[in-house]
């Protein structure tokens, strides 16, 4: 995340990257964000109450759970300003060799813009509509795809079979 965030800062949630042993209350003092989404450089916590917390003092216990369940923290802790997204609007796209792909052939302009600024041969882009209707980047994946989400296997293989 620290690599792509500066390139897409205007299209994603505000984010601070901190050490895993930080005093989160002190580091986040004065921000007054409506909540926080917590992840390390690679992944969020997908069990229990998840990675959403309301107060900075809830972050350290969440980081401890991440460490317990995953065995390590990858890089630092990404503290993201919680944004409200419209339910059911998150969708995954892929970029392969600079070309953007969609599971349904409709590719938002934001995906194409990401494909132009991210220098990687293969990555995923998760987008969702924020409550105000703005399309936002939720996450970029570095090719270590854990799930195709709404992509059928045939469509995914079709994308990978294309060579430029």
Feature-to-residue mapping (PLM):
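ATP-dependent carboxylate activation and anion-phosphoryl transfer catalytic cores
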Residues: 99, 106-164
């Amino acid at each position: 995340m620290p690599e792509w965030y500066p390139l897409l800062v205007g299209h994603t949630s505000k984010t601070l990257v901190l050490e895993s042993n930080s005093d989160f209350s002190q580091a986040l003092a004065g921000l007054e964000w409506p909540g926080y989404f917590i992840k390390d450089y690679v992944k969020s916590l997908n069990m229990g109450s998840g990675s959403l917390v309301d107060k900075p003092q809830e972050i350290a216990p969440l980081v401890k759970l991440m460490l317990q369940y995953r065995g390590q923290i990858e890089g630092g802790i990404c503290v993201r300003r919680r944004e409200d997204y419209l339910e059911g609007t998150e969708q995954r796209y892929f970029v392969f060799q600079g070309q953007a792909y969609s599971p349904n052939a409709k590719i938002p302009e934001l995906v194409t813009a990401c494909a132009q600024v991210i220098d990687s041969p293969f990555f995923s882009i998760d987008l969702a509509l924020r409550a105000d209707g703005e399309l936002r980047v939720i996450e970029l994946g570095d090719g270590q795809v854990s799930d195709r989400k709404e992509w059928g296997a045939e469509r995914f293989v079709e994308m990978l079979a294309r060579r430029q």
